[in-house]
């Protein structure tokens, strides 16, 4: 009975039920008296009202029979609408605060609607624009909890829509109705879109006819701002849903009983699956099962498990299996068979026991599903992230550090929280969490970006901001503003990076007092473990130090990463006036100190005796320190202050591209069906593959050897670590320091796990934009363009110098723009500048050019589109000024001989003729 009432209410929403093409209408009916309908009366006779709530607005739909002519619509004694000649075709009353507020009427034969609004005790006419504005005010006052897409394959009860299922004509009729506060804008089945509402239209209900899991007929009801209902019909044809007419829809319902789908019967052995006829589907939290689905054109008529027959169709021409779901193949397996017959269940259940497979019931399957869901479920705390069930990756974009979290295989995040406060939870509908980006400010999570995904390829992004007390959801625009604020805040905290402290890599602070340890005595030996200073034997210039001068904090290069040998050491020179000592550093007490008369070789490095000793005499301690005797005067490098290294700008699409690459790699690993045992977390994998960034949470900075150009007199210096396995000079060679900042390169001998080898392939950056121009914005790995030619030092490949006019590029020829060359035919051509590897991965340390004002010509003409919006490559390389376009110079033309000027008397005959004609015309 409930279903009949529901179906009747839906069908009553059609205005086509009031009058059709059967020749029965108010004008065609003879002897029918006009009636007056009162909206306050509770009539149930020939005319009545039906209450409908759609998109947050409540309507009273006027319904009447085909033999009823309504010529007047009233509210008590107040007339709303009246027409003596043409009867009412359809109409509705819009209610607000449990009372009539507005109304619209459509007369027979006139498609234009008439709108009315209640003003006091009277009803006045209203324009369509004003009616829509009033209707929008009512909708805005209604609290909308969600706007969702309806997946007709999900037929379980949930908080967004109601589901009614009944058998009709041998098929399953399912009705979907959105609940109050939830708006449906799109309808689809699995991954195939059926209908998408445009503009302000919303879907009010959907009726679908199923045979097994196959959706055959669909009827979609929608409503617009005018309150007018419309319906659209679709039919399943060749794996698509095509629109059909109402007549074909009604005829298809009658033919459902005799419906037959042509297919090829096949047999399935769950221990030996033929992937040419079947494909596999992933398990989800809602359905934690291993799915076997026949390809299009096939249907399972016989099911085996080795030698045991599990199912055999008694009528292979009609009855078969559409899908096979296997739950927990290792412990107490249960199989669910989705059949295409036997309404309304369409399912059969089998359980594996000691004696073999036996039939079972649905309650046992529900217990198994709950058990598997408990195994898959995990939670995410934004301030306490565990890598047991989650992949954790620390990333950096410009100066902003954040963390990307994704669930591991066979794990589903059902709740995201901050302690006891819940930020998001799983609501069903297969809308699961696929990725989360957590932004930390002042040591705690302050901004969270959650990506929720359903079965159809669509994403629902949720942004949550930490307030003073609670977390609140924000829009995408507010999220972008918060990101800009965090980037600006992070830039203020970072000190400018100079050449001296470019090798620190987030090491402990300098100075003897910064580490909390007492200063070392002059005769103390320095160890090789931890971040120690250089050994005494490595710097001969200390002997020429002025006696009595206190030991000053050494440069940043004295703090080397642990277990990294260093070959060349720059002697500490005089105090640089451009780099004054930090006033916060503690002053070390001055003690008289004399130079050592003889220098002992370092006990750690006996190989020093093999190196040639310098024969230059030692200079007495002068007031000013001379240059090092180990380096000629001509090779002395004078330090100059350099501007801070510019940081690359914040790229909002960086995490999107990184997430897309990870999603594609994960999908490929699932398709190959290879089981990869991951003993290490995703964090340890990224340490070996991604470039490290100082200060990034969840990571430890990798030590990088200092870089210093080689000199002819001192090409090598012994390493500091005596435990180093090899002391060959080739293993400690450091390539010359480049004038550009480069990304850290992954060592060639570092083995990568299979999962990261697939993850860090060449990414498809055009996955979302589908623009080929975006492909060059993200370069490949820097190690791909590394010079791997054999040299004198096999342990560390030699790299060629990058000078200002010799750059490592992706092409064999890098030229300045405008250079002329000849092509294969000998014709001179003008070469264009190609995008080099340095342009993609490095940043120039040159000062930024000053932008000048825009120059226009005298007529006020602005630049063209290319000048106004130059391409990105030109923005990075140069700053162009707008200049008025130069007018093309006109070539001199040969002057023509001037014609002789006619005398004035030559025009007298013409003037007289004109006067005569004018006189004649005037007389006539």
UniProtKB/Swiss-Prot annotation:
It comes from the Eukaryota. A lipid is attached at residue 904 (GPI-anchor amidated aspartate). Its main location: membrane. One of its GO terms (cellular component) is side of membrane. Keywords: Cell membrane, Glycoprotein, GPI-anchor, Lipoprotein, Membrane, Repeat, Signal, Sporozoite. Residues 522-532, 573-588, 653-673, 737-747, 770-783, 816-825, 868-878 have a biased composition (Basic and acidic residues). Residues 857-867 have a biased composition (Acidic residues). Residues 592-617, 724-736 have a biased composition (Low complexity). Residues 490-907 are annotated as: Disordered. It is a lipid-anchor; GPI-anchor. It is found in: Cell membrane. Residues 1-19 form the signal peptide. Residues 879-901 have a biased composition (Basic residues). Residues 905-924 form a propeptide. The keyword Lipoprotein applies. This is 104 kDa microneme/rhoptry antigen. It comes from Theileria parva. The lineage of its organism: Eukaryota, Sar, Alveolata, Apicomplexa, Aconoidasida.
């Amino acid at each position: 009975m409930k279903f009949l009432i529901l179906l009747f209410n839906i069908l009553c929403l059609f205005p086509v039920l009031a009058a059709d093409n059967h020749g029965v209408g108010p004008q065609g009916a003879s002897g029918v008296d006009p009636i007056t309908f009162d909206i306050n009366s509770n009539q149930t006779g020939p005319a009545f009202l039906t209450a409908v709530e759609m998109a947050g607005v409540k309507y009273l739909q006027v319904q009447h029979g085909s033999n009823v002519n309504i010529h007047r619509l009233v509210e008590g004694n107040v007339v709303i609408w009246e027409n003596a000649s043409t009867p009412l075709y359809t109409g509705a009353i819009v209610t607000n605060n449990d009372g009539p507020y507005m109304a619209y009427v459509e007369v027979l034969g006139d498609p234009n609607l008439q709108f009315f609004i209640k003003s006091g005790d009277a009803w006045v006419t209203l324009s369509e624009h004003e009616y829509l504005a009033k209707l929008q005010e009512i909708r805005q006052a209604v609290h909308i909890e969600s706007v969702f897409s309806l997946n007709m394959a999900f037929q379980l009860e949930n908080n967004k829509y109601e589901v009614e299922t009944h058998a009709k004509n041998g098929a399953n009729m399912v009705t979907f109705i959105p609940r109050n506060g939830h708006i449906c804008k799109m309808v689809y089945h699995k991954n195939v879109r059926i209908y998408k509402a445009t503009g302000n239209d919303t879907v009010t209900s959907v009726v679908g006819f199923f045979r097994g899991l196959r959706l055959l007929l669909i009827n979609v009801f929608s409503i617009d701002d005018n309150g007018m209902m419309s319906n659209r019909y679709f039919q399943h044809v060749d794996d698509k849903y095509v629109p059909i007419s109402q007549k074909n829809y009604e005829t298809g319902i009658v033919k459902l009983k005799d419906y037959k789908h042509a297919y090829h019967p096949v047999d399935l052995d769950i221990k030996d699956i033929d992937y040419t006829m079947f494909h596999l589907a992933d398990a989800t939290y809602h359905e934690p099962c291993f799915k076997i689905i026949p390809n299009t054109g096939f249907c399972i008529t016989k099911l085996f498990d080795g030698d045991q027959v599990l199912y055999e169709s008694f009528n292979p021409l009609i009855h078969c299996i559409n899908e096979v779901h296997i739950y927990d193949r290792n412990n107490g397996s249960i199989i669910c068979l989705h059949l295409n017959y036997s309404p309304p269940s369409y399912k059969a259940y089998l359980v594996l026991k000691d004696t073999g497979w036996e039939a079972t019931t649905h309650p046992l399957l529900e217990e198994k599903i709950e058990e598997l869901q408990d195994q898959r479920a995990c939670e995410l705390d934004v301030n306490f992230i565990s890598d047991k069930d989650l992949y954790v990756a620390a990333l950096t974009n410009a100066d902003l550090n954040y963390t990307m979290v994704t669930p591991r295989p066979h794990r589903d995040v059902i709740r995201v929280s901050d302690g006891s406060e819940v930020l998001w939870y799983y609501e069903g509908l297969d809308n699961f969490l696929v990725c989360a980006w957590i932004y930390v400010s002042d040591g705690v999570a302050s901004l969270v970006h959650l990506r929720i995904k359903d079965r159809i390829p669509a994403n629902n992004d949720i942004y949550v901001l930490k307030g003073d007390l609670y977390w609140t959801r924000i829009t995408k625009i507010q999220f972008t503003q918060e990101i800009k604020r965090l980037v600006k805040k992070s830039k203020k905290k970072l000190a400018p990076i100079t050449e001296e402290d470019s090798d620190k890599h987030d090491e402990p602070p300098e100075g003897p007092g910064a580490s909390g340890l007492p200063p070392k005595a002059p005769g103390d030996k320095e160890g090789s473990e931890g971040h120690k200073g250089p050994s005494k034997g490595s710097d001969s210039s200390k002997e020429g130090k002025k006696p009595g001068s206190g030991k000053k904090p050494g440069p940043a290069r004295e703090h080397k990463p642990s277990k990294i040998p260093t070959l060349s050491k720059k002697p500490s020179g005089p105090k640089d006036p451009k780099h004054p000592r930090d006033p916060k550093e503690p002053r070390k007490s001055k003690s008289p100190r004399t130079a050592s008369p003889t220098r002992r070789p370092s006990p750690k490095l006996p190989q020093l005796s093999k190196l040639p000793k310098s024969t230059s005499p030692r200079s007495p301690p002068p007031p000013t320190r001379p240059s090092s005797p180990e380096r000629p005067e001509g090779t002395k490098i004078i330090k100059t202050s350099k501007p801070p290294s510019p940081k690359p700008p914040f790229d909002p699409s960086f995490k999107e591209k990184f997430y897309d690459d990870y999603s594609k790699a994960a999908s490929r690993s699932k398709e190959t069906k290879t089981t990869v045992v991951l003993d290490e977390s995703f964090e340890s994998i990224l340490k070996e593959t991604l470039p490290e960034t100082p200060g990034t949470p969840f990571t430890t900075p990798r030590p990088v050897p200092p870089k210093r150009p080689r000199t002819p007199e001192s090409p090598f210096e012994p390493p500091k670590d005596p435990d180093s396995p090899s002391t060959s000079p080739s293993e400690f060679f450091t390539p010359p320091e480049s004038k550009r900042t480069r990304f850290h390169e992954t060592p060639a001998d570092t083995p990568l796990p299979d999962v990261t080898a697939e993850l860090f392939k060449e990414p498809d950056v055009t996955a979302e934009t589908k623009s080929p121009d975006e492909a060059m914005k993200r370069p490949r790995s820097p190690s791909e363009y590394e010079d791997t030619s054999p040299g004198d030092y096999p342990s560390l490949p030699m790299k060629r110098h990058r000078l200002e006019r010799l750059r490592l590029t992706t092409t064999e020829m890098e030229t300045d723009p405008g250079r002329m060359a000849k092509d294969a035919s000998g014709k001179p051509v003008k070469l264009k500048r190609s995008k080099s590897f340095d342009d993609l991965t490095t940043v120039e340390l040159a000062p930024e050019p000053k932008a000048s004002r825009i120059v226009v010509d005298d007529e006020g003409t602005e630049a063209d589109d290319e000048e106004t919006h130059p391409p990105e490559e030109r923005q990075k390389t140069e700053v162009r000024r707008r200049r008025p376009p130069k007018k093309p110079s006109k070539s001199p033309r040969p002057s023509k001989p001037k014609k002789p000027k006619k005398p004035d008397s030559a025009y007298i005959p013409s003037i007289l003729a004109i006067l005569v004609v004018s006189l004649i015309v005037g007389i006539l």
